[in-house]
Amino acid sequence: MRKWMILLAAVLMLLAGCGKEPAVAGLSDEEFHQYFAEDYARPVSNITEITEENGGLMLKTDLGAPITAMKDGTVAWAADIGWNYGYGRLALVQQEDCYLLYAHCSQVAVKTGDTVKQGDKIGEAGDTGHTEDGIRVGVYRFPLEDVALVTGADGTVSAFTVNGEVSGIGME
């Protein structure tokens, strides 16, 4: 009987270790604020890695994780469909002194013209466009009066220009 009890205890200990791996804790606030000023909130709660690419940052996180506004602003362009020149579904939010780009969303929860407050839902992290799971965040600082949105005949925004030059997003 004692052998069976020891065997049962050993099996139970082995099974206890077969559960799901614990979630990665993610980047600390200190690590996050190496990339963003203190007044910027995290756009997703579980950032596991930040990589710099093409003038923006790729924030690796769980597919479908809620994306929230890093600062207050107005949605200048929201695209919940299409490839959008490799950026996939995206939202471009105008701040007081810059634009914030949230790209590669699995879905976008805002529309062009919406006002967002820091912490409001923008969409969900995805893998649309040319990327892996996560979101791309870009901070574009240029005089806002130099920016023009490019609209089609139906009034939908398809890109933007800075001083007449096509920006890094929206167009090739």
Regions found by a protein language model. Name each.
Residues 69-109, 133-136:
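Zn2+-dependent peptidoglycan hydrolase active-site motif and core
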Residues 19-89, 118, 162, 166-172:
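Surface-exposed, glycine-biased beta-strand/turn segments
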Residues 120, 136-172:
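Acidic, glycine-rich catalytic/binding loops that coordinate metals and/or anionic ligands
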Residues 50, 78-79, 108, 125-128:
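Residue-level recognition of beta-strand microenvironments
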Residues 4-11:
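Sec-dependent N-terminal signal peptides
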Residues 1-4, 19:
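Positively charged n-region of N-terminal signal peptides that target proteins for export
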Residues 14-17:
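C-terminal motif of bacterial Sec signal peptides marking the signal peptidase cleavage site
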